Amino acid sequence: MVALSNALSRVFGSLAGYEFPSFIQKGINALYVKIFKIDLSEFEPLENYKSLNALFTRSLKKERPFDKAPNICIAPCDALITECAFLDNDSALQIKGMPYKAHELVGEINPLNPSFFYANFYLSPKDYHHYHAPCDLEILEARYFAGKLLPVNKPSLHKNNNLFVGNERVTLVAKDVQGNRLYFVAVGALNVGKMRFNFDKNIQTNAKARFTQTYSYNPPIKVKKGDNLGNFEMGSTIVLFIQNTAFKDLKEKSVKFGESIGEFHAN
């Protein structure tokens, strides 16, 4: 199953990256935009993308404004927040009724502190596929975990136990603006060609080699709130674990990168 889902995703990624003659590619792009009801008002027109992958990974034409105050946490991506809550004895939900252990997802030996709040950001095929820093960060490690590439949509989340933990993923281990530990987890999915990280091109995902690898940064990599951390090559999920933060009521709400979603408490 692992080999099949990953092989299918590699094949899809290769096809999505193929550049057809411009008149054919324009038609393919137009069909994709129509099927998934993609709003291109913030992006280049569909004829400007030389492949489906270029359309998937489109960049914003203009920077989005966001609150620069250091105590404000912003949405890292355009997404539907499917679950969010404080951890309960290290348990988080991938979807209602489907718990998993947070420490297993992020790659820690011990359970996470109950002060962690988590939020699942589901990026659908129509969404902007880049992910950004939710606050000023110092990235200490990037942990790559090999795994399956099962779909991360709601039917799949209801069907498959421990889906996030079993899927390929990259966990960014960081310090937030207050110096507290923060985890930013990019979860792979079926037909996601790759997950890319702008601060370290050495991080390889959806490769044939099936191994776990840790990339350590000393000194830490400093990024500013709103900085582009990377992108999926198709929609998937970001899981954010963050401490000492008062979040808004977010469950089942769609958010855009740059929207204020919470406020840090004083330590």
Swiss-Prot record:
<protein>
    <recommendedName>
        <fullName>Phosphatidylserine decarboxylase proenzyme</fullName>
        <ecNumber>4.1.1.65</ecNumber>
    </recommendedName>
</protein>
<comment type="pathway">
    <text>Phospholipid metabolism; phosphatidylethanolamine biosynthesis; phosphatidylethanolamine from CDP-diacylglycerol: step 2/2.</text>
</comment>
<comment type="subunit">
    <text>Heterodimer of a large membrane-associated beta subunit and a small pyruvoyl-containing alpha subunit.</text>
</comment>
<dbReference type="InterPro" id="IPR003817">
    <property type="entry name" value="PS_Dcarbxylase"/>
</dbReference>
<keyword id="KW-0670">Pyruvate</keyword>
<feature type="modified residue" description="Pyruvic acid (Ser); by autocatalysis">
    <location>
        <position position="236"/>
    </location>
</feature>
<keyword id="KW-1003">Cell membrane</keyword>
<dbReference type="InterPro" id="IPR033178">
    <property type="entry name" value="PSD_type1_pro"/>
</dbReference>
<keyword id="KW-1208">Phospholipid metabolism</keyword>
<feature type="active site" description="Charge relay system; for autoendoproteolytic cleavage activity">
    <location>
        <position position="132"/>
    </location>
</feature>
<keyword id="KW-0443">Lipid metabolism</keyword>
<dbReference type="Pfam" id="PF02666">
    <property type="entry name" value="PS_Dcarbxylase"/>
</dbReference>
<feature type="active site" description="Charge relay system; for autoendoproteolytic cleavage activity">
    <location>
        <position position="78"/>
    </location>
</feature>
<dbReference type="InterPro" id="IPR033177">
    <property type="entry name" value="PSD-B"/>
</dbReference>
<dbReference type="GO" id="GO:0004609">
    <property type="term" value="F:phosphatidylserine decarboxylase activity"/>
</dbReference>
<dbReference type="GO" id="GO:0005886">
    <property type="term" value="C:plasma membrane"/>
</dbReference>
<keyword id="KW-0444">Lipid biosynthesis</keyword>
<comment type="similarity">
    <text>Belongs to the phosphatidylserine decarboxylase family. PSD-B subfamily. Prokaryotic type I sub-subfamily.</text>
</comment>
<keyword id="KW-0210">Decarboxylase</keyword>
<comment type="function">
    <text>Catalyzes the formation of phosphatidylethanolamine (PtdEtn) from phosphatidylserine (PtdSer).</text>
</comment>
<dbReference type="GO" id="GO:0006646">
    <property type="term" value="P:phosphatidylethanolamine biosynthetic process"/>
</dbReference>
<keyword id="KW-0865">Zymogen</keyword>
<feature type="active site" description="Charge relay system; for autoendoproteolytic cleavage activity">
    <location>
        <position position="236"/>
    </location>
</feature>
<feature type="site" description="Cleavage (non-hydrolytic); by autocatalysis">
    <location>
        <begin position="235"/>
        <end position="236"/>
    </location>
</feature>
<feature type="active site" description="Schiff-base intermediate with substrate; via pyruvic acid; for decarboxylase activity">
    <location>
        <position position="236"/>
    </location>
</feature>
<keyword id="KW-0456">Lyase</keyword>
<keyword id="KW-0594">Phospholipid biosynthesis</keyword>
<keyword id="KW-0472">Membrane</keyword>
